[in-house]
Every structure is written in C-alpha cells, then in structure tokens.
Regions:
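Rossmann-like AdoMet
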Residues: 1-159, 166-167, 174-181
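Structural motif
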Residues: 83, 108, 183-185, 215, ...
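Short catalytic micro-motifs in class I SAM-dependent methyltransferases
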Residues: 88, 186-193
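Conserved, structured regulatory domains from eukaryotic proteins
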Residues: 115-117, 131-135, 143, 158-171, ...
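A short, conserved alpha-helix within the catalytic core of class I
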Residues: 164-173, 194-212
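Conserved beta-strand signature within the Rossmann-like core of class I S-adenosyl-L-methionine
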Residues: 185-187, 206-225
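Rossmann-like AdoMet/SAM-dependent catalytic core
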Residues: 228-325
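Kelch-like beta-propeller repeat domains
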Residues: 310-656
Length: 656
C-alpha cells in the first residue's frame, strides 16, 4: 500500500511536529529536577517551563521507559551484544544519557525516524560539541539522498526511513549493522498510535518475526471513550495527528491480545497508575511530589489511566439519566463551593474559570420556565479562592471557610454570608453581605480540599471541619468544631479510631452527626472507607461503617444522604472500566451498589470532578451538578458547559 500521497505527507508532517512539543516538555521536566538528563536541552532552542501537571506526566513516562531499559540491561548482562531499536525516536537523548551514565556496556542504539527528522537531528548532533564528543568514531553520511543512514558509529546509528516501509527498514537496519539474532529492546514511545492501525500492527508483527530474541516496549494511550479520552482525541484531530490504534485497542486487555495475535509469546500491559503506585518507591514519589506546588490531582490520576485489578460491580439496572438543567446558564468553573440559601436559590462562590480565579459570586435562581443566573453584589469581606467550603446555616445564610488562592497561599478565614434586607434586589443582581467572623479559641490551620459540615449538638450549632491539605501537609486528619452561636472554636470529646488523613473527600450530615466517605489519602491513594461521627452524651464517637461489597476507591466526588442512603456521585477512581457514576450506600445495612450514568443527552464530555452539587427538593429526588472539569494535560482545558440534573427517584425507590 502506498504511503506517500500528498495528504499522507501532510499528516506525516503534523506527526513530526508532536516530536518538537514532546522534547520541549521533557526538557522542562528535567530542568525542574524530575529526572536527570543533561543532554535534552541541546535539542531545543531554549528551555521553557511547563505546568507542574505536564512535568509530572512526562516524568512518569520517562521513568516507565527507563525502568524497562534497566530491566532489559539486567536480564541480558551476560550477553556480549545487545541492541536498542528506537522507532520514531525523534529528538530523544536516550543514547547520550545512557552513555554518560556508563550504562551502555555492549549495547548499540539504532534510532529510526522520518528522513526529515533524522536530518535535523544529525545536524544538531554534528554542530554540538557536547553531543558529538560522545561519538568519537562517528561517521556522518554525506549523500543522504541515496543513503538512509545519517550517522553511523560503533554504539549509535541514526537512520532516516519511514517505519511503515518494512522492506526498506529491514535493508537499512542490516546495512547499519543491526544483528537480527541479538537480544534487542524495541522501543515505541507514543509512535505507532499515529499510524493507520494496519501499519502499526504490521510493525509489531515484523518485529516479532525478524527479532526472535527481543522485547517490545510500547508506551501508548488507552481509554478513548471516557471524557479525558474524548478531549485528547479532539486535540490531536485539530493538529491533524489522529490517534488510530486507540479505537481498536482501547484498553490493556485489547493491547495484550494485540501483541499475542501478532506473534509475541507473552505480553505484560501495565497502565501508569499501576506503575506509579506499585513500582516506584514511596521515597521517590515523595521526592517528586515535593518538587513543585501541585493541585491537579484529578487530571493527574485520570491521565495516568487506570489500575485494572479492581472492577466496579455495576448494578444490573438501567443507568441513571442525566440532562442539562432546563434553560440553564453557562457556568464553566472548577473548584467552586455551593450552598442552598433557600429552596430554588443556590449560591456559588470561588473556583477557577477560563480567565483564572473566579472573582464573581453568583446565584442560581429557579423560575417557572427554568433557571437564571444572577451576579452577587457583595458587601464586606468576600474571599476569593479555590476548594473552599460553603455550608448552609439555619436562617438562610451560609458560612464560607478556607480555600486557597494558590497552592502556596491557603486561608483559614471564616466568612458569614447573609442576605442584606436593607437593599432592594434587582433582576440581574442579588445583594449579599460577606463578613469575616472573628472567632476565639484554637482554630484549624489554613487549608483547602477539606469538608465543613453543619452539626447540631445540645442546642448548639457547630461547623465541623475535617481533613484537607496545606502547602506543607499533603493530607490532614484533624477535626475542629466551630460553635456558630459563640463564634468559638470549641474543644469536644471525640473517641474512637480517627479516620485516615485525606483530602477531596465528602462529609454529609447524618444521624445527628455526619458520615465521611472516600477521598485521596496518604501517598496519593484513593480511599473507599466510610466513618460515622456519632453523637454521644459526652461528645462524639468515630465508628467505621462496614460496606459490602466495598465501593471502588474514589476522590473529588460529591455526596448527599437521603433518608438512610448516601448517594455518591462522580469523582475520580484509578480502575479500568468506565468512569464513576453513582454509588448508593445504605448506611443502615452497609450494602453498596454502583450505578452507571446515562450521559447521552449531554453534548459535551462530562467530567464529574472538582464540581459541586445540591439537592433540589426536600425529598432529595433530584440533584444538580454544577461546574467541574480541568486542564487535560497538554491537550487543553475542558470545563463542563452547563449545570446538569440527575433524577434520583429510581434509586431512592429501590431497596438496596
């Protein structure tokens, strides 16, 4: 099949452009100390700093490939001749880094890429003293019109040939000195996926056939149909760099079968969450997590994909139907806080939108024919931040606590929000008073991603603050009681085993106390436990709720208790099948079922994390989900466009 049409050449050029973007991101990660590589910087014009999320993503990618290389070196250390065949190598510095580490030994590196990419790389190497000094025996081929070998040396060979042209690749590699029977690591780092699937399958097949003593290391995307996957695919479509294999091989199982069917005896497929948590030492994860301020845990977990060892036990019931809120305004914000001021009136504060931190509080108001959004004319000390809490209090007001303006600047302010009866309300704006509450006693340290829950105890009203994180503490487990009548942080007697430290969890009023569920725990591992803070005559007691079957661990979800059922919506989990829908937990019996969401009526990829939610009626039969989304790695920012509603009646009417 011909692969040199004008249209294909345009696509090839677009794919080559992904190399330039990738190497800039790798240089950024190296410059921030994620990994050591003094040679990458020689392949870019200048060092640019990428966002922490991108740096972490490229670190995991680099570390995973490096792990496979070291395993290969160890397994073949007794062999006199070993080879690395890097397909679509681009401006990778693999050879130069390994040479500097003294890790090559008897290893020869063969790099293959499009002729134009190889030509540019050869020119960079030949013009850079640091690079060419590592190749004292190099031979630069002058006539590159007739010879696909651009640089030849004893341990490094740079070849410019289209890997889809099997016969040409075979002839050129043989001419460059590749020994087909020698132990060889074939490396494809986000390369084959840009080819039409029949071509990438052919490459996997000929590698198995021609290199009988080889291992094939492939780093590639999976999960095309979840919201992140849809955003990622749209990004590459805009770049004219379609990801092809993703549709036919959407998960680790399909990729495993692919390699077996193409002639490989064994295939081990591991996603990057599994690699990050199971193969990296905790000390190394702590080192990396301390390099830069970071607060994008949802997208980081989604980006690394899924741990396939735990599958949700979906209930054999129809998915819950969700749909955009009737005549709802556009609210594209993540990390907001919400509170129900009165039936049909929802206050929204804080968060981050497309233009940065959202400085405008707003109110959603239910009318006869739909919902409208009114701006808030704030009087007093409004606090702007992300991941603050806003808790409804008796009388129609709310209390705002904590949050952050940046990962280095959290707050511990307590702000009382009340309506201002002295001012007339207009159709387009609502008058609210934001007043800092001066509190006595020892309060919690500044934090965000915590929970604040209203508890009534012995004729007093308390705001119960639990968990979260600070700029120095990755997770917190302390608990604090603020008496709203006395404006005093009160010491209360609490017995029982304290829940594990966490953030991005949920806490719901229940049984005179509250119930906490899930969150992100120590070391970045999602949790699936539930704890009941039960009132006693002398204070409170923590009790563990035994759930069966255990729900899939998750964080950045939302939850509400309706009667004896805790309804957990959305969030992020690190497992293979789909994305979180609704978990229904019976707090009396401990039974738990997972129910999927039918998102077919929502015309955009629905990302249910970093969002807020409220029940819309006293029976709890309908829930509204507002905001949510985030930065999708280097693929752009995706924010949910409109609030959506979930009809909870099917699950409330059933006995789970």
């Amino acid at each position: 099949m011909p692969v040199n049409s004008r249209r294909e050449q345009g696509k090839d050029a677009a794919v080559q452009g992904t190399n330039d973007s990738s190497v800039v991101s790798k240089v950024s990660a190296a410059a921030q100390g994620y990994f050591h590589d003094d040679f990458l910087k020689h392949f870019v014009c200048k060092v640019s700093r990428r966002a922490p999320l991108i740096n972490r993503g490229y670190y995991v990618r680099w570390k995973a490939v490096d792990h496979c290389l070291k395993q290969f070196f160890h397994a073949t250390q007794s062999c006199s001749r070993r080879q690395i065949l890097s397909l679509g190598a681009g401006f990778d510095s693999l050879y130069f880094r390994l040479h500097a580490e003294g890790a090559l030994g008897g290893v020869t590196v063969f790099e293959v890429d499009f002729p134009e990419v190889a030509r540019r790389k050869a020119a960079l190497i030949n013009s850079n003293t640091c690079l060419k000094d590592t190749l004292p025996d190099r031979e630069t081929v002058s006539n590159q019109q007739t010879n696909a070998v651009f640089i030849r040396s004893g341990h490094y060979n740079l070849i410019g040939v289209d890997v889809r042209k099997e016969q040409q690749v075979e002839v050129t590699l043989s001419a460059a000195g590749l020994q087909w029977d020698a132990p060889t690591l074939v490396l494809s780092e986000v390369v084959l996926t840009y080819m039409e699937t029949q071509w990438s399958d052919a490459v996997i097949g000929w590698a198995a056939k021609l290199l009988p003593q080889s291992v094939f290391v492939m780093y590639e995307q999976i999960h095309p149909d979840d919201p992140f996957g849809r955003v990622m695919q749209n990004h590459f479509l805009k770049l004219n760099s379609t990801i092809h294999a993703l549709k036919q091989y959407p998960d680790t199982v399909a990729q495993t079968q692919r390699f077996i069917q193409k002639g490989w005896e064994k295939c081990v497929c591991m996603d990057m969450n599994q690699f990050y948590f199971d193969l990296l030492l905790e000390e190394e994860r702590q080192r990396v997590e301390g390099l830069e301020p970071f607060d994008e845990f949802e997208i980081f977990g989604i980006m690394l994909s899924s741990i396939p060892h735990m599958t949700p036990q979906w209930a054999e019931r129809p998915p819950l139907v969700i749909q955009p809120m009737c005549r709802s305004p556009s609210i594209e914000v993540v990390g907001m806080a919400s509170a129900l001021l009165a039936p049909g009136i929802i206050l929204l504060t804080g968060g981050c939108g497309r233009s940065g931190r959202d400085t405008v509080a707003r109110v959603l108001i239910k009318e006869k024919d739909g919902w409208k959004c009114a701006c808030v004319e704030a009087h007093g000390d409004q606090v702007v931040g992300l991941y603050q809490t806003l808790t409804s209090i008796p009388g129609g007001g709310a209390v705002l606590f904590g949050g952050r303006t940046s990962p280095l600047n959290p707050t511990d302010s307590v702000v009382c929000v009340t309506s201002d009866p002295s001012n007339e309300q207009s159709q387009s704006a609502v008058q609210l008073s934001f007043k800092n509450m001066v509190c006595t006693g020892t309060g919690p340290k500044p934090r965000w991603r915590h929970t604040s829950t209203l508890i009534c105890y012995k004729d007093k009203t308390f705001l119960f603050v639990f968990g979260g994180r600070t700029e120095k503490d990755p997770v917190l487990s302390d608990a604090h009681f603020l008496c709203l009548e006395d404006k005093h942080w009160t010491e209360m007697t609490v017995v029982g085993a304290v829940p594990e430290a966490r953030h991005s969890h949920s806490a719901c009023p229940y049984g005179g106390g509250l119930v906490i569920f899930g969150g992100l725990g120590k070391g970045g591992r999602p949790l699936c436990d539930a704890f009941y803070l039960r009132p006693t005559s002398s204070g409170f007691c923590w009790e563990t709720k035994n759930l069966h079957p255990p729900p899939v661990p998750r964080y950045s979800h939302s939850a509400h208790v309706v009667n004896e059922k805790m309804v957990v919506v959305g969030g992020v989990w690190l497992q293979a099948d789909g994305v979180p829908g609704v978990a229904v937990i019976n707090l009396s019996t401990g039974s738990c079922v997972e129910i999927q969401l039918d998102t077919s009526s929502v015309p955009w990829p629905l990302m249910l994390h970093s969002f807020c939610s409220e029940l819309l009626d006293s029976e709890g039969s309908e829930m509204v989900l507002i905001g949510g989304g985030g930065n999708c790695f280097s693929f752009g920012t995706h924010l949910n466009l409109h609030p959506i509603t979930v009809d909870l009646r099917p699950i409330l009417c059933n006995s789970y």
